[in-house]
Amino acid sequence: MNIYDQLQAVEDRYEELGELLSDPDVVSDTKRFMELSREEANTRETVTAYREYKQVIQTISDAEEMIKDASGDPELEEMAKEELKESKAAKEEYEEKLKILLLPKDPNDDKNIILEIRGAAGGDEAALFAGDLLTMYQKYAETQGWRFEVMESSVNGVGGIKEVVAMVSGQSVYSKLKYESGAHRVQRVPVTESQGRVHTSTATVLVMPEVEEVEYDIDQKDLRVDIYHASGAGGQNVNKVATAVRMVHIPTGIKVEMQEERTQQKNRDKAMKIIRARVADHFAQIAQDEQDAERKSTVGTGDRSERIRTYNFPQNRVTDHRIGLTLQKLDIILSGKMDEVIDALVMYDQTKKLESLNN
């Protein structure tokens, strides 16, 4: 099936979905209605672009016909030639756009995410930088209209982040933040550095799609759940009732501790969300490691320890090592204006996937 047959099939299905979504039997079936609504939303951009493309093709045909009929009318002929030139350029742009829109979709792209940030190499400075990254993602989420909820956090003595786990919810969160997993390196002069020397520290970021219970069911026999008293600063118990939850997935050893909420049930629910995402991600990563060829055609190697980006404060520079992108906009990017970096990563990934399909 060539690209035009594929596009026509997508348009035919889109029209069929429109009819199905107005069918009373479908409307009364909430689950099916939601599934079909999601499918319609996912194909809408492709169908809109395809219809605009067909209009451009018609405009080209009309302009060519006008040029034939414009003999003796130089002004009309010139106008038709200009329209033909513009329409042919638009045709090429639409063809590239449609190729990208037809690329296989990542099934996780529309999902919310679990975001984990940890200070790594560099002690206090690494923890402070982890805090900077947390602020950057929080502000970026605001620009996108997403909800950002810190689920679990651990700070050090200087106010840095030892570890933070957050849920980011909204439209297409995973599609934009999935490229953030990896090691983020910072180069700057620490506040405690009296000689003015630049130090290098690292924080790690992990982005996992939220996993619903219906998508990945963990056998309760594989979980060990401990209930204990939440502790505050200095280690003192802050609750008379045991509300904190420690959850361990026995087969993998993955552990989650949750004490942010005031009730045991809320802590249990949040811990379950995180452990479900981590366990699903653990097995997905094993499967991904077995697909080296596919991984080479996407952004980076997929290695969670891979250094993906450097933030150089003295030079106000951010470098993404996977795509060779360097921007002298560190202050802007850390303030949450990440679109230029993320758009470049998305475009690079799409280009590589197109090349892979064409080979």
From Swiss-Prot:
InterPro entries documented for this protein: PCRF, Pep_chain_release_fac_I, Pep_chain_release_fac_I_sf, Prokaryotic/Mito_RF, RF-1
Keywords for the protein's UniProt record, in alphabetical order: Cytoplasm, Methylation, Protein biosynthesis
Cell compartments where the protein resides: Cytoplasm
Residues bearing PTM N5-methylglutamine: Q236
Domain of life: Bacteria
A Gene Ontology molecular function term of the record: translation release factor activity, codon specific
SUPFAM superfamilies registered for this protein in UniProt: Release factor (SSF75620)
PTM remark: Methylated by PrmC. Methylation increases the termination efficiency of RF1.
Disulfide bond sites: none
Gene Ontology CC: cytoplasm
Major subcellular location class: cytoplasm
Function according to Swiss-Prot or TrEMBL: Peptide chain release factor 1 directs the termination of translation in response to the peptide chain termination codons UAG and UAA.
Family membership noted in the UniProt record: Belongs to the prokaryotic/mitochondrial release factor family.
NCBIfam families documented for this protein: prfA, PRK00591.1
Name this protein carries in UniProt: Peptide chain release factor 1
Organism of provenance: Streptococcus pyogenes serotype M18 (strain MGAS8232)
Gene expressing this chain: prfA
